[in-house]
Protein backbone atom coordinates (compact mmCIF):
# COMPACT_ATOMS: atom_id res chain seq x y z
CA UNK A 1 0.00 0.00 0.00
CA UNK A 2 1.46 3.37 -1.03
CA UNK A 3 1.56 6.40 1.27
CA UNK A 4 -1.22 8.03 -0.74
CA UNK A 5 -3.36 4.90 -0.48
CA UNK A 6 -2.91 4.97 3.31
CA UNK A 7 -3.95 8.65 3.34
CA UNK A 8 -7.00 7.79 1.24
CA UNK A 9 -7.99 4.96 3.59
CA UNK A 10 -7.79 7.29 6.61
CA UNK A 11 -9.74 10.01 4.81
CA UNK A 12 -12.59 7.70 3.86
CA UNK A 13 -12.66 6.15 7.34
CA UNK A 14 -13.50 9.57 8.81
CA UNK A 15 -16.82 9.55 6.98
CA UNK A 16 -18.46 7.44 9.71
CA UNK A 17 -18.01 10.32 12.20
CA UNK A 18 -20.06 12.71 10.06
CA UNK A 19 -23.58 13.28 11.39
CA UNK A 20 -26.54 13.54 9.02
CA UNK A 21 -27.91 17.06 8.52
CA UNK A 22 -24.83 18.57 10.17
CA UNK A 23 -22.25 21.15 9.15
CA UNK A 24 -18.80 19.57 9.02
CA UNK A 25 -15.51 21.29 9.82
CA UNK A 26 -12.98 20.49 7.11
CA UNK A 27 -9.23 21.01 7.31
CA UNK A 28 -6.48 21.28 4.72
CA UNK A 29 -3.94 19.06 3.02
CA UNK A 30 -3.41 15.94 0.95
CA UNK A 31 -5.12 13.54 3.37
CA UNK A 32 -8.05 15.93 3.83
CA UNK A 33 -8.46 16.08 0.05
CA UNK A 34 -9.33 12.38 0.18
CA UNK A 35 -11.84 13.09 2.96
CA UNK A 36 -13.42 15.83 0.82
CA UNK A 37 -13.81 13.32 -2.03
CA UNK A 38 -15.52 10.97 0.43
CA UNK A 39 -17.71 13.74 1.85
CA UNK A 40 -18.96 14.55 -1.65
CA UNK A 41 -20.57 11.10 -1.82
CA UNK A 42 -22.92 12.07 1.03
CA UNK A 43 -23.37 15.77 0.27
CA UNK A 44 -27.14 15.26 0.03
CA UNK A 45 -27.14 14.06 3.65
CA UNK A 46 -25.29 17.00 5.20
CA UNK A 47 -26.09 20.68 5.43
CA UNK A 48 -22.62 21.69 4.30
CA UNK A 49 -19.14 22.45 5.59
CA UNK A 50 -16.93 25.08 7.17
CA UNK A 51 -13.47 25.22 5.65
CA UNK A 52 -10.09 26.10 7.16
CA UNK A 53 -8.52 27.25 3.89
CA UNK A 54 -9.26 28.76 0.50
CA UNK A 55 -7.88 25.62 -1.16
CA UNK A 56 -10.32 23.32 0.63
CA UNK A 57 -13.16 25.77 0.01
CA UNK A 58 -12.52 25.71 -3.74
CA UNK A 59 -12.32 21.92 -3.85
CA UNK A 60 -15.57 21.49 -1.92
CA UNK A 61 -17.43 24.04 -4.01
CA UNK A 62 -16.22 22.30 -7.17
CA UNK A 63 -17.71 19.06 -5.83
CA UNK A 64 -21.01 20.73 -4.95
CA UNK A 65 -20.58 20.80 -1.17
CA UNK A 66 -22.05 24.03 0.31
CA UNK A 67 -19.43 25.99 2.28
CA UNK A 68 -20.47 28.31 5.11
CA UNK A 69 -18.67 31.13 6.88
CA UNK A 70 -17.79 30.06 10.42
CA UNK A 71 -19.42 33.18 11.85
CA UNK A 72 -22.80 32.02 10.55
CA UNK A 73 -22.56 28.61 12.24
CA UNK A 74 -23.60 27.86 15.83
CA UNK A 75 -22.38 24.26 16.05
CA UNK A 76 -19.81 21.97 14.46
CA UNK A 77 -20.12 18.37 15.59
CA UNK A 78 -16.81 17.30 14.03
CA UNK A 79 -13.68 18.81 12.54
CA UNK A 80 -11.66 16.53 10.26
CA UNK A 81 -8.05 17.45 9.55
CA UNK A 82 -4.61 15.98 9.08
CA UNK A 83 -1.34 16.56 10.93
CA UNK A 84 2.34 16.86 10.10
CA UNK A 85 3.22 15.04 13.34
CA UNK A 86 1.15 13.51 16.14
CA UNK A 87 2.26 11.84 19.37
CA UNK A 88 0.52 9.23 21.50
CA UNK A 89 -1.08 11.96 23.66
CA UNK A 90 -2.82 13.36 20.56
CA UNK A 91 -0.66 16.52 20.54
CA UNK A 92 0.06 17.65 16.99
CA UNK A 93 2.23 19.83 14.81
CA UNK A 94 0.16 21.27 11.98
CA UNK A 95 0.57 24.09 9.50
CA UNK A 96 2.81 22.68 6.81
CA UNK A 97 0.22 24.02 4.39
CA UNK A 98 0.22 27.46 6.10
CA UNK A 99 -3.45 27.26 7.17
CA UNK A 100 -2.71 26.79 10.88
CA UNK A 101 -4.60 29.81 12.26
CA UNK A 102 -7.87 29.01 10.54
CA UNK A 103 -7.41 25.33 11.38
CA UNK A 104 -6.98 26.20 15.04
CA UNK A 105 -10.08 28.41 15.03
CA UNK A 106 -12.30 25.76 13.43
CA UNK A 107 -10.89 23.10 15.77
CA UNK A 108 -11.77 25.29 18.76
CA UNK A 109 -15.41 25.48 17.68
CA UNK A 110 -15.84 21.77 16.93
CA UNK A 111 -17.11 19.33 19.54
CA UNK A 112 -14.85 16.55 18.26
CA UNK A 113 -11.53 16.68 16.38
CA UNK A 114 -10.92 13.73 14.06
CA UNK A 115 -7.28 13.59 12.95
CA UNK A 116 -6.52 11.62 9.77
CA UNK A 117 -2.94 10.64 8.90
CA UNK A 118 -0.79 7.95 7.35
CA UNK A 119 1.53 6.07 9.68
CA UNK A 120 4.59 8.18 8.82
CA UNK A 121 3.11 11.05 10.88
CA UNK A 122 3.17 9.22 14.23
CA UNK A 123 6.11 10.21 16.45
CA UNK A 124 7.25 9.74 20.04
CA UNK A 125 8.45 13.34 20.47
CA UNK A 126 7.24 16.31 18.42
CA UNK A 127 9.74 18.57 16.70
CA UNK A 128 11.48 16.77 13.87
CA UNK A 129 9.00 18.45 11.53
CA UNK A 130 9.64 22.22 11.71
CA UNK A 131 7.07 24.08 13.78
CA UNK A 132 5.20 26.71 11.71
CA UNK A 133 4.52 30.06 13.37
CA UNK A 134 2.19 32.59 11.71
CA UNK A 135 3.52 36.11 12.21
CA UNK A 136 2.36 39.63 11.41
CA UNK A 137 4.84 40.77 8.71
CA UNK A 138 6.31 43.79 10.55
CA UNK A 139 7.13 41.59 13.56
CA UNK A 140 8.99 38.91 11.62
CA UNK A 141 12.54 39.76 12.73
CA UNK A 142 11.56 40.41 16.34
CA UNK A 143 9.63 37.15 16.60
CA UNK A 144 12.53 35.25 15.02
CA UNK A 145 14.90 36.58 17.70
CA UNK A 146 12.50 35.50 20.45
CA UNK A 147 12.19 32.03 18.93
CA UNK A 148 15.98 31.67 18.97
CA UNK A 149 15.86 32.40 22.71
CA UNK A 150 13.48 29.44 23.06
CA UNK A 151 16.07 27.20 21.44
CA UNK A 152 14.70 27.14 17.92
CA UNK A 153 16.19 27.91 14.51
CA UNK A 154 13.53 29.95 12.68
CA UNK A 155 13.54 30.15 8.89
CA UNK A 156 11.35 32.55 6.91
CA UNK A 157 9.12 30.63 4.48
CA UNK A 158 9.90 32.58 1.33
CA UNK A 159 7.08 33.47 -1.03
CA UNK A 160 4.27 32.28 1.26
CA UNK A 161 1.48 34.57 2.42
CA UNK A 162 -1.25 33.02 4.55
CA UNK A 163 -4.97 33.38 3.80
CA UNK A 164 -4.89 36.03 6.56
CA UNK A 165 -2.16 38.08 4.87
CA UNK A 166 0.63 37.07 7.24
CA UNK A 167 3.99 35.28 6.93
CA UNK A 168 5.29 31.95 8.25
CA UNK A 169 8.43 31.21 10.24
CA UNK A 170 9.33 27.51 10.29
CA UNK A 171 11.18 26.70 13.51
CA UNK A 172 13.72 23.89 13.27
CA UNK A 173 15.64 21.95 15.93
CA UNK A 174 12.98 22.06 18.64
CA UNK A 175 12.70 18.99 20.84
CA UNK A 176 9.21 19.54 22.16
CA UNK A 177 8.93 17.75 25.50
CA UNK A 178 6.06 19.89 26.83
CA UNK A 179 3.85 20.85 23.87
CA UNK A 180 1.20 22.71 25.88
CA UNK A 181 3.78 24.89 27.62
CA UNK A 182 5.64 25.72 24.40
CA UNK A 183 2.38 26.46 22.58
CA UNK A 184 1.56 29.08 25.21
CA UNK A 185 5.10 30.52 25.31
CA UNK A 186 5.22 31.10 21.57
CA UNK A 187 1.70 32.54 21.41
CA UNK A 188 2.67 35.10 24.07
CA UNK A 189 5.35 36.62 21.80
CA UNK A 190 4.07 39.96 20.50
CA UNK A 191 3.46 39.71 16.75
CA UNK A 192 2.68 35.99 16.74
CA UNK A 193 -0.79 35.17 15.44
CA UNK A 194 -0.54 31.53 16.47
CA UNK A 195 1.74 28.53 16.13
CA UNK A 196 1.29 25.04 14.75
CA UNK A 197 1.25 23.21 18.07
CA UNK A 198 -2.20 21.73 18.68
CA UNK A 199 -1.74 20.56 22.27
CA UNK A 200 -4.22 22.62 24.26
CA UNK A 201 -6.81 21.44 21.77
CA UNK A 202 -5.51 18.10 20.53
CA UNK A 203 -7.27 15.38 18.60
CA UNK A 204 -10.11 13.35 20.10
CA UNK A 205 -9.92 10.53 17.56
CA UNK A 206 -6.92 9.52 15.46
CA UNK A 207 -7.38 7.49 12.28
CA UNK A 208 -4.08 6.12 10.96
CA UNK A 209 -3.74 4.65 7.51
CA UNK A 210 -1.33 1.69 7.65
CA UNK A 211 -0.37 -1.14 5.28
CA UNK A 212 -2.71 -3.32 7.37
CA UNK A 213 -5.69 -0.96 7.17
CA UNK A 214 -6.92 1.94 9.27
CA UNK A 215 -6.16 1.92 12.99
CA UNK A 216 -8.29 3.97 15.40
CA UNK A 217 -7.03 5.64 18.57
CA UNK A 218 -9.06 7.74 21.01
CA UNK A 219 -7.91 10.35 23.51
CA UNK A 220 -7.97 9.23 27.13
Curated annotation (Swiss-Prot):
Catalysed reaction, written as an equation: aldehydo-D-ribose 5-phosphate = D-ribulose 5-phosphate
Recorded superkingdom: Bacteria
GO MF: ribose-5-phosphate isomerase activity
Gene3D superfamilies associated with the record: 3.30.70.260, 3.40.50.1360
Pathway membership, UniProt: Carbohydrate degradation; pentose phosphate pathway; D-ribose 5-phosphate from D-ribulose 5-phosphate (non-oxidative stage): step 1/1
Gene Ontology biological process: D-ribose metabolic process; pentose-phosphate shunt, non-oxidative branch
Keywords, comma-separated and alphabetical: Isomerase
GO cellular component, one term: cytosol
Function statement: Catalyzes the reversible conversion of ribose-5-phosphate to ribulose 5-phosphate.
Assembly: Homodimer.
Family: Belongs to the ribose 5-phosphate isomerase family.
Protein name, per record: Ribose-5-phosphate isomerase A
Organism: Shewanella baltica (strain OS155 / ATCC BAA-1091)
Gene assigned in the entry: rpiA
Amino acid sequence: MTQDEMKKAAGWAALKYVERDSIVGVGTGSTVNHFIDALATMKADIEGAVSSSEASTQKMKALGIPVYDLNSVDRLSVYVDGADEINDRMDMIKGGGAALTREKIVAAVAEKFICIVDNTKQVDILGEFPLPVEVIPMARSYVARQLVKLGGDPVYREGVVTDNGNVILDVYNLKILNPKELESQINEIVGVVTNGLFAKRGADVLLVGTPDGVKTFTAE
